[in-house]
From Swiss-Prot:
Chain's role: Catalyzes a mechanistically unusual reaction, the ATP-dependent insertion of CO2 between the N7 and N8 nitrogen atoms of 7,8-diaminopelargonic acid (DAPA, also called 7,8-diammoniononanoate) to form a ureido ring.
Cofactor annotation: Mg(2+)
Record-stated family: Belongs to the dethiobiotin synthetase family.
A biological process term (GO) from this entry: biotin biosynthetic process
GO cellular component: cytosol
Domain of life: Bacteria
Primary location recorded for the protein, binned into one broad class: cytoplasm
Keyword terms: ATP-binding, Biotin biosynthesis, Cytoplasm, Ligase, Magnesium, Metal-binding, Nucleotide-binding
Complex formation: Homodimer.
Positions bound to Mg(2+): 16, 50, 109
Organism name: Streptomyces coelicolor (strain ATCC BAA-471 / A3(2) / M145)
Locations listed in the record: Cytoplasm
Name used for this protein in its record: ATP-dependent dethiobiotin synthetase BioD
Pathway this chain belongs to: Cofactor biosynthesis; biotin biosynthesis; biotin from 7,8-diaminononanoate: step 1/2
Length: 238
């Protein structure tokens, strides 16, 4: 099944911009792409959410949400506060499966980190990936503190028998500090997975045309790009 689940080590690590970059690179390669947001929180009914931002940046991707809730909280908490039925992992998996019959690639973007709860029963994005038997791309931050959250997420994925094809740094700084430079080597070591890209900080503020043109250069060949981890490390490592 052509489904890739995208999660992060936490909030604000660049998941949506990375999702847009993966979509843009796949579209540039001639594939049809759908982006499914499992649960959108923190936006009103008439506001653009993460899926719409992906479409704005990436281009002609099909976008969908399973549910959205107004409070900027974990999906389970936001659903409870709104008095609404929470999202169930089975719903997300069903929606992704349907999209997969009509598209070459389906990107399922989570909310927050891997184990953020969808419902009172403890359903998470990890359960969605398990139901779909889909690989999980992990978006990480560049700097100090990322090694612990990255390793914890990688361990959880493997404990569930889920595939971790690689990591993408969601916001590579223009002037990386020593920790960020060292992490280029340390992130693959602690996670047991290769670096598959680094999206520059501020990429989401580019014009859609500039974003689409640049996206393949931020991602490695397994993600339809031309980025080379060794060359990047030679330029930016300590």
């Amino acid at each position: 099944m052509p489904v890739l689940v995208i999660t992060g080590t936490g909030t604000e690590v660049g998941k949506t911009v990375v999702t847009a970059a993966v979509a843009a690179a796949a579209l540039a390669g001639g594939r049809t792409v759908a982006v499914l947001k499992a649960a959108q929180t923190g936006v009103g009914p008439d506001e653009a959410g993460d899926a719409q931002e992906v479409a704005r940046l990436a281009g002609t991707a099909t976008v969908a949400e399973v549910a959205r809730f107004p409070d900027p909280l974990a999906p389970g908490t936001a659903a409870r506060r709104a008095g609404r039925t929470p999202v169930r992992p089975e719903e997300v998996a069903e929606a992704a499966t349907k999209l997969a019959t009509e598209h070459d690639l389906v990107l399922v973007e989570g909310a927050g980190g891997l184990l953020v709860r969808f419902d009172a029963e403890g359903g998470t994005l990890a359960d969605v990936a398990g139901l779909l038997d889909a690989p999980v791309l992990l978006v990480t931050s560049a700097g100090l503190g990322t090694l612990n959250t990255t390793e914890l997420t990688a361990r959880e994925l493997r404990s569930r028998g889920l595939e971790l094809p690689g990591l993408v740094i969601g916001s590579w700084p223009g002037a990386p500090d020593l920790a960020a430079r060292c992490n280029l080597a340390d992130l693959p070591d602690v996670s047991g997975a290769p670096l598959l890209g680094a999206v520059p900080a501020g990429a989401g503020s580019l014009s859609p045309a500039a974003f689409r043109s640049a996206a393949p250069h931020w991602l490695a060949p397994p993600l339809d790009g031309t980025w080379d981890a060794d060359a990047f490390g030679d330029r930016h490592g300590p």
